[in-house]
């Protein structure tokens, strides 16, 4: 499967991430990522990016702090070169996994010595549906791209925003009110 485009969008109604993978042959794989899978996938992808970049001798020889800086610079370089402006093409000739997105229940990441990253994506199925899976072979720039799109979508979903209880909101309002009404004391 030669991947041409990736798209990750937050669907507020479903409260899921819709991942669409388009091939050069105009085939499209559609995947639903739940909050649990979407958030948990970010760290392994970051690790995969770090391992891919560690294949570069300049990165390998660096100390830990320098290695992190070099990896961050490579991510920035990717973002500068990536085509993030071209809209995702909605023309599709085939949907190998069907029209409905596959609900992802497990993702396994394998990094190969040549820098190719393999994602084995599974849907355990349930009573009404048969288990499905697909394998995506991503070149390093696609891993960078998927990580970037996933991070953006998770941010838009607000899944990682802290949840404030009414008590916390009330306490914050009371503290602000007390600060505003507090008498100013001047000393000489």
Features from the language model and the residues they span:
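The feature marks the first
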Residues: 1-55
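Intrinsic, low-complexity N-terminal interaction/targeting segments
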Residues: 1-17, 74-126, 182-186
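Short, well-structured hydrophobic secondary-structure segments
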Residues: 37-83
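A eukaryote-biased signal for long
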Residues: 107-110, 152, 170-188
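Alpha-helical rod/repeat scaffolding segments in eukaryotic adaptors/tethers
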Residues: 23, 27, 31, 55, ...
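Acidic, Ser/Thr- and Gly-enriched intrinsically disordered low-complexity segments
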Residues: 43, 49-50, 102, 116, ...
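Mixed-charge, glycine-accented linear interaction segment located at domain edges/termini
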Residues: 38, 119-176
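DNA polymerase processivity clamps
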Residues: 59-71, 100-112, 165-173
């Amino acid at each position: 499967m030669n991947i041409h485009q990736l798209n990750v969008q937050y669907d507020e109604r479903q409260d899921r991430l819709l991942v669409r993978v388009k091939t050069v042959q105009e085939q499209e794989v559609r995947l639903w990522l739940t909050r649990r899978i979407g958030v948990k996938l970010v760290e392994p992808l970051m690790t995969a990016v770090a391992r891919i970049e560690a294949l570069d001798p300049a990165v390998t020889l660096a100390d830990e702090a320098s290695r992190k800086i070099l990896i961050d610079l490579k991510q920035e370089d990717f973002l500068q070169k990536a085509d993030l402006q071209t809209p995702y093409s909605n023309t599709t000739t085939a949907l190998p996994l069907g029209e409905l997105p596959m609900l992802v229940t497990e993702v396994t990441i394998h990094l190969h010595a040549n820098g190719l990253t393999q994602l084995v994506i599974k849907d355990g199925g349930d009573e009404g549906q048969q288990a499905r899976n697909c394998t995506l072979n991503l070149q390093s720039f696609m891993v960078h791209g998927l990580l970037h799109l996933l991070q953006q979508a998770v941010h838009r979903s607000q899944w990682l925003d802290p949840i404030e209880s009414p008590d916390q909101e009330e306490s914050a309002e009371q503290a602000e009110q007390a600060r505003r009404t507090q008498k100013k004391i001047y000393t000489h």
